[in-house]
UniProtKB/Swiss-Prot annotation:
Effect of residue 80 to A: Reduces U4 snRNA-binding by about 50%
GO molecular function, one term: U3 snoRNA binding
Region annotated Important for U4 snRNA-binding, chain positions: 96-128
UniProt xrefs under SUPFAM superfamilies: L30e-like (SSF55315)
Protein name listed in UniProt: NHP2-like protein 1
Length: 128
């Protein structure tokens, strides 16, 4: 997927380095049961106020099926970011199917707290 193929509505788009860090953290949060997979589950975590950040796939077809999430994230003050591939996001989530959105959730005493805060700061720098 080249720069021209990416829908301009998929903003902010993570670069290759941030994408790798994001997908690694998504994979770890799946192991720690801190991950919700799918657009509907991500919406639920936002509404319940238990989302740390949202990761969405820029190649979702049509992209409009997940474009309600950035609006909800802005309302709830939750960082969000797009990655290029729904296939890669699906693999990181530990499922064999493509995943177009996922949410890393809040958990008391989580061992991933430092990594989550680091990623949140990286995402917020993209939004500026």
């Amino acid at each position: 997927m080249t720069e021209a193929d990416v829908n301009p509505k998929a903003y902010p788009l993570a670069d290759a380095h941030l994408t790798k860090k994001l997908l690694d953290l998504v994979q770890q949060s799946c192991n720690y049961k801190q991950l919700r997979k799918g657009a509907n589950e991500a919406t639920k975590t936002l509404n319940r106020g238990i989302s740390e950040f949202i990761v969405m796939a820029a190649d979702a077809e049509p992209l409009e099926i997940i474009l309600h999430l950035p609006l909800l994230c802005e309302d709830k003050n939750v960082p969000y970011v797009f990655v290029r591939s729904k296939q890669a996001l699906g693999r990181a989530c530990g499922v064999s199917r493509p995943v177009i959105a996922c949410s890393v959730t809040i958990k008391e005493g989580s061992q991933l707290k430092q990594q989550i805060q680091s990623i949140q700061q990286s995402i917020e720098r993209l939004l500026v």
